[in-house]
Amino acid sequence: MRALALLLLLPATVLAQDPLGTLLGAGVRLRPEYDGSSREELQPIPIVRYYGRVLFARTTQGILEGGARSEVLRGLNLGVQLAFEEGNDRTGLDPGASLGLHAEWDTKVGPAPLSVLFRTRHHLDSDRGNQADLRATVGVYGGHGAFVAVFGQATWASDEWVRSYYSTGEGGLLFSALGVEGAYDLSSRWVLVWSVHGRWLHGDAASSPITERKTNYFLSTGVAYRF
């Protein structure tokens, strides 16, 4: 928290407006084979960022998701989303999808843009249970074609989700994460995006028989076209 407070003291070069627009592209991500694995893999990832008057699609809030939302108060949006959910080959869990609700508040802390998201995710396969995310992102620099933000997230999971992913255990706080993400204008139309974060497992996920590391790191980069 002290580091975050220092970042918020950056001068007025911090962005007050959305600099990114609509993005579509592709990249790669270095991640553990599953959350808690000691082995890493490189996987292709989409880069999506679209906000219409009602519909949206994005990969900028931790998962690939799309849906509809509406601004009910200034800066406060409520909506519904369909999201892609990762599988786990170690426990024979196939990738799937979830349906959920979210509330997102966009405001400022001084000159810095702040976004706070609460999101529920109910897996379409009822045996996989539910998850809930609380995520906050704050912009810390914007200038010279670059944008940098820090983010933190906490995710909770039901008993069913923990057992389907880790083979045993009970629900509760699943993981917490802290990271940095950014974008850089390669040209007026092309944007380089990147992200790095650490993820810490908690509860029965951390003590699962298949958990080899309680802390994992994720790195991603890619190029997107700005419409």
Q: What annotation goes with each model-predicted range?
A:
Residues 60-92, 216:
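Mid-chain, structured segments of secreted extracytoplasmic proteins
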Residues 21-25, 56-58, 75-81, 113-117, ...:
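Residue-level detector of the transmembrane beta-barrel scaffold of outer-membrane proteins
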Residues 20, 40-46, 74, 93-99, ...:
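Residues that define the transmembrane beta-barrel architecture of outer-membrane proteins
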Residues 24, 46-48, 66, 101-103, ...:
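Membrane-embedded beta-strands of outer-membrane beta-barrel proteins
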Residues 54, 63, 105-109, 121-214, ...:
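Outer-membrane beta-barrel transmembrane domain signature
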Residues 1-21:
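Cleavable N-terminal export/targeting peptides
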Residues 16-64:
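Short glycine/proline- and aromatic-enriched beta-strand/turn motifs that initiate or cap beta-hairpins
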Residues 32-44, 88-95, 171, 204-209:
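Surface-exposed strand-loop-strand hairpins of Gram-negative outer-membrane beta-barrel proteins
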